[in-house]
Amino acid sequence: MPTPGTGSVPELQLVPFQLGHFPILQRWFATEKELVQWAGPALRHPLSLEQMHEDLAESRRRPPLRLLWSACRDDQVIGHCQLLFDRRNGVVRLARIVLAPSARGQGLGLPMLEALLAEAFADADIERVELNVYDWNAAARHLYRRAGFREEGLRRSATRVGRERWNVVLMGLLRQEWAAGGAGND
């Protein structure tokens, strides 16, 4: 089981998500498209704490089904990310990864992702980490490839946002690839 708060890199530390972080997170999504890009189609704009109750409940189970993290720099919340556990199969899904608009473009995406991967693989039973990303999100796909993820498949027309249909790319990283420093597959 990952130890909360151990995933840190220079200038950035992951800390367990607290209810006091929610108002900060909520401000980062001005439109439905921004919210769906982050959370998938399950949540509705505007984001409300009530919508996150299921995530929070899953984080309180023993063992937790989900861990919610805030990324902090200089005691300021500048990001959010989650781990979803499929312990039976030794798989973790990275989910709901976002940096504050003011923190983007500063090279913080990879350190946050590396800290999150360290948390995921701290559990010796985890063999695989995977994620979904929309195919049009070239910056995120590039970041994930830099961290060692490989594109493994495409779910066409998987998400509806208004009148648009978005394709979803499945990406995965195995423990041995991560341990070997799988970064640089871009």
UniProtKB/Swiss-Prot annotation:
Top-rank taxon: Bacteria
Keywords: Acyltransferase, Transferase
UniProt entry tagged with the keyword NAD: no
GO molecular function: acyltransferase activity, transferring groups other than amino-acyl groups
EC number(s) per entry: 2.3.1.-
Binding positions (CoA): Q37, I97, V98, L99, G105, N137, H142, L143, Y144
Entry keyword Kinase: no
Residue span(s) of domain N-acetyltransferase: 12-176
SUPFAM superfamilies given in the database record: Acyl-CoA N-acyltransferases (Nat)
Database matches in InterPro entries: Acyl_CoA_acyltransferase, Bact_Acetyltransf, GNAT_dom
Pfam families: Acetyltransf_1
Disulfide bonds: none
Role this protein plays: Catalyzes the transfer of an acetyl group from acetyl coenzyme A (AcCoA) to an acceptor substrate and releases both CoA and the acetylated product. It prefers the antibiotic chloramphenicol.
Subunit structure, interactors included: Homodimer.
The name this protein goes by in its record: Acetyltransferase PA2578
